[in-house]
């Protein structure tokens, strides 16, 4: 009579084949695949960001001047909310680990509680990223872009603080036409018009003697170079368009690469 013998080797395999690779279970192996792929992906992002920042360090936007907002509060809070988001992300990771540990110890109520905290933390983080994107895209002060793609920002010479376009731009009786299929090239689309035209910014600048231009270049003190009144007027002669906020092509904060990395890294992180 034939008989079937079950060996310990057969019990140690998963999905056919020989013994478990490195003695790991299927779930643990897939978790390591996830961790390593994550590490490689973010390493690539951060290495590219670091290289680009080092390459253009003299004109790279200052993060403390870009991320200054906190929901429901008005004022200048450099990187405060970014630090809060980092704290929420770390704590949600901790609660997830605690939930897994509670599951191993068969503590159902603890698992439910820690998973609830993890979900709340994840919702806060993703919601914060959505708010951060909206604020970044909308912009704060506005700027003008030159023929060479450089960004010129504006400063109040009396106080040294940034000046928004709305603070000095003139209102001119000029007609502004947005490109549409019926009045242009049918396969070319155009975004919404900025609040002010280049001419309105120039005329307003001439009428306010206390407004000067701040360039992208960073001096030895780590601050953006502020031009004199005459130098500002000379620079503005090369202005081609008004930039409000940021996207993948134009960026009022400075280098467009800064905005590109912001969208790709934070976007991948949010979906991840």
Each language-model region and where it sits:
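...captures the hydrophobic TM-helix bundle architecture rather than a specific catalytic motif
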Residues: 1-272
